[in-house]
């Protein structure tokens, strides 16, 4: 059987543990939920950053393509691929004139800053 002195020591140790733990009445599950939410937000942020990086690379490719003076493809789906290596030279008389919507797209792409 425990004496009163031993019981007081146990109570003091228990009080010290409870005081130093500082749970403030918050359950551990609440912290686990916030950690899960943090990881979810981090995952969304990382996937968003991947998409932004992919889009930046694609816009850079398009910007480089337009900056080199390459012709814009026809919208009716016809192919403008050169059949021979010599056909890769651009000739102004064969280039398609840009419509209003195409000009706006090209303006935006030209103004994009490469990084």
Swiss-Prot record:
What function is annotated for this protein?
A: Parathyroid hormone elevates calcium level by dissolving the salts in bone and preventing their renal excretion. Acts by binding to its receptor, PTH1R, activating G protein-coupled receptor signaling. Stimulates [1-14C]-2-deoxy-D-glucose (2DG) transport and glycogen synthesis in osteoblastic cells.
Which terms does the record give in the GO molecular function aspect? hormone activity; parathyroid hormone receptor binding; peptide hormone receptor binding; type 1 parathyroid hormone receptor binding
Q: Name one GO biological process term.
A: transcription by RNA polymerase II
Complex formation: Interacts with PTH1R (via N-terminal extracellular domain).
Q: Where in the cell is it found?
A: Secreted
Q: What is the protein name given in its UniProt record?
A: Parathyroid hormone
Superkingdom of the source species: Eukaryota
- A GO-annotated cellular component: extracellular space
Family per similarity comment: Belongs to the parathyroid hormone family.
Which organism does this record belong to? Bos taurus
């Amino acid at each position: 059987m425990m004496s009163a002195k031993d019981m007081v020591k146990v109570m003091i140790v228990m009080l010290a543990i409870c005081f130093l733990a500082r749970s403030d009445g918050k359950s551990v599950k609440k912290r686990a939920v916030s950690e899960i939410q943090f990881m979810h937000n981090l995952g969304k942020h990382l996937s968003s950053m991947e998409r932004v990086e992919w889009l930046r690379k694609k816009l850079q490719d398009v910007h480089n393509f337009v900056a080199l003076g390459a012709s814009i493809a026809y919208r009716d789906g016809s192919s403008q691929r050169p059949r021979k290596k010599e056909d890769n030279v651009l000739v102004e008389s064969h280039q398609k004139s840009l419509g209003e919507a195409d000009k706006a797209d090209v303006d935006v792409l030209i103004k994009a800053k490469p990084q």
